[in-house]
């Protein structure tokens, strides 16, 4: 009887476990890390773990003389390159600006080369050519044969440690070359330092100024075999007679016996605080010399993350989907040490904090889809860590982050994009109630600033082009989204007066609508709209928009689609304008921003302000058109090839759009908790939710030609709505979607079945 009761208890526990109903599958096999590494995708290729601080991978020669001035090497890697200079420990993924690529290590032999090689002239400096057939990239692992050195390089990583394994097939003057002056983009080393502790341990730092204006990277380096000799250099001159060197551009060659030890392993721990912490990170995360085990652990971490969604479909779609999901976990990266210490934006060290601090907040991009995706997939702890980091940044710099990079505020892009993320965490109950007041203080203080036109918004008026000669409309529309978020948060917290004020502010977008041309247009202080006016003009930083034109910004009102429809005079005119937008010529008239890519008509899937556009149709009763547009964007602009992303992945937002859309839904209004149905690409997807329940989406009649939703069932019952809410999703259960090659124009058409019935 006792044994029987025990078995019953055990079975009950297993029944509640997500793994009991959804056993772990081998999903890392479907990831192709090279997708998005060619052309404008700018994704990181190398070894890391989900959200890891260390992103260890190859750095190449940025071809700054091409038509994009080297733009396509922002991550440090581009698939079309045929050379590798060496391996660095920090990288950005999908960004439109380059930086990082810190702590360069070159596994070399022969003459010590002090400078990176020039393009197509590998003998002029360090680096090696390689063949694509000898390059392997998998989640948590990167491998390549460096032809010029005849060194097999294998890389893996933990959260804070890069783990190298080098097999030397040429032993002549074998050495590891460390270049602390190596830089990416306009970055520049401002101070550097290396100290030898013993024959297998070195510590140091690299301080630099670039996109991150005051970056500090401390490191500790340990080798598996003794270093027999060390040569230190300042720039290109050797420095003798010391085990400690300091200067603006310190370099070192660490020589070892490659005849006796053909294989050398290297661990590099990083810290923003100290070399002591960097050493401790190595001890905590990689206490043993076992590369195979470290590689397996990295793979297991990725596999566990990918299993949050079990997605069934054809092989190609599965590869695209899981690679997209993989890319959504490259940022925001961990930015603290194993002991909880981190460097704040105010350059003070915060010791032993009770949350995991993060950085690389590309918020103008990620507030739209990536953070809503994290809210569906990750437990409260991780999402709380994101918010607690933002609140700490607020306390340190006086406002919420805009684009936070390695302890630095870059103020890149427009608007106040942290506010929607913070507000959403409060509205959905993700943040602990004890933190609500600080969160509100941060939101309100940030929204009540004076910079970048906010002084006009505070007074409930438009930003005149007399005061802001470019991007005024972009700033204003993004402010309106943030103000809506503040309004909803104030309502949640019972702050009636604040709610009334921000309700007025989020509708200020209406003041930019020029009925004469049917677009949002910049206005002079005297009330006149900008003339002459060209709705297609998209020259970078020379119009009223940011990385777009008037056509593309006409739809950037996700917080108030009802109000936007009313500006056009109702559903009919709104749909007519939307149809024109998605079917007109894609010609931008020359000198357009490089960020405007992936065009269907003027709809630009390659840049974030249009990511919600396909799902607007459902608000006006023609959800079927949105299904067709979303399917077309997925089929044309997401492929399994190296150039398989039509634009910058933008720290995972481009990929997050695909993850949502391929499952057949998207959060058009990122904080409303409403997901609009589109056109699922799979046969079945099972999502493990933060509450450990599962939501299974089953698709009938899945085929490339079947873009349209014919009908939906929810837990076996007919479901006529073109949307589903966050609260409903968290209940788990099933959604059955039947697809068709012809549209069901009545599906989701009734006013009560449109998202507008509950959103706004």
Language-model features and meaning:
Residues 24-420, 424-477, 490-511, 517-518, ...:
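Accessory carbohydrate-recognition regions in carbohydrate-active enzymes
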Residues 708:
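Extracellular attachment/recognition segments
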Residues 482:
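ATP-dependent phospho-/nucleotidyl transfer catalytic cores
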